[in-house]
């Protein structure tokens, strides 16, 4: 899977997209066959997959956290399942935020582990079994929708309202991970984050296909202290411009930005540049929670950058406050029906 989305994926399709179309067609065929025909293992407990249509960020991780909070409110013990992208460990691992680093398990699992039991595993089937053995009674899988390794009891596809599906082309012509029709067929519901127009066409198509549609916003968790502050905003995430908009919405004056690749591990020179530039201009450094975990536990100038950077925390808040609980309940009902069918009673 492509890890970085080139800028032309997010604009109207041009000659580059069309030049790559033969490769995209072949990629799409393979992806469709895998999604439709692969033998999926049955998870030991109810499983929600939080995925997206495209390469890159759409808000899956904060959505997964919101669902875990709803599960805990129901008296359940949720467990997160992640492949651990960006981490080096290739064995099934229960993530310990006090022990593991982003280089070990990936940055997103460290964020998830602050909320609930989290397992990283290259083989998601093994990871699901480990979560159940650790006491999880519902699994929330962060990404992996197109992998076709596990049966989902509920598949929620997240789409950003400002980016949508980019130019709508398949990898490598565009950011789409598998043919839209195949993805919709395997989806239970869509979650549109934000109120921009870029996702509307796909949302209407999904609604016509009978898929449930949810809407949410990304909400800042700040105390207003950023208002009027001159900042150097830095981020190594899939959509840094979205973060910079969030910083501006917090009232900060964004004097400069520094963007890095998603899941980027910072070099000493990059760290020194951020610290020295902010100090010379009198700017406050500000970043994302996901970037901060890649600095912790840090030493030397990495620790200095972590200490000098402010984090703007965010959460996903559904327009319908009951929506996360409804998703949990639907997942539990689907899992019960799945088990009845497996036992020959459905």
Curated annotation (Swiss-Prot):
* Swiss-Prot/TrEMBL catalytic activity: a lipid A disaccharide + ATP = a lipid IVA + ADP + H(+)
A Pfam family (short name) is: LpxK
Q: Give, as in the UniProt entry, the pathway in which the protein acts.
A: Glycolipid biosynthesis; lipid IV(A) biosynthesis; lipid IV(A) from (3R)-3-hydroxytetradecanoyl-[acyl-carrier-protein] and UDP-N-acetyl-alpha-D-glucosamine: step 6/6
User: Which InterPro entries does the UniProt record give?
Assistant: LpxK, P-loop_NTPase
- Show the GO MF annotations: ATP binding; tetraacyldisaccharide 4'-kinase activity
Binding-site list for ATP: 54-61
**EC number(s) from the headed UniProt entry:** 2.7.1.130
State the UniProt keywords alphabetically. ATP-binding, Kinase, Lipid A biosynthesis, Lipid biosynthesis, Lipid metabolism, Nucleotide-binding, Transferase
Q: What Gene Ontology terms describe where this protein resides (cellular component)? A: plasma membrane
Q: Which domain of life is it from?
A: Bacteria
Q: What function does this protein fulfil? A: Transfers the gamma-phosphate of ATP to the 4'-position of a tetraacyldisaccharide 1-phosphate intermediate (termed DS-1-P) to form tetraacyldisaccharide 1,4'-bis-phosphate (lipid IVA).
What HAMAP family does the annotation carry?
LpxK
Which protein family is it in?
A: Belongs to the LpxK family.
Q: Which PANTHER family match?
A: TETRAACYLDISACCHARIDE 4'-KINASE, TETRAACYLDISACCHARIDE 4'-KINASE, MITOCHONDRIAL-RELATED
Protein name in the entry: Tetraacyldisaccharide 4'-kinase
Q: What's the gene? A: lpxK
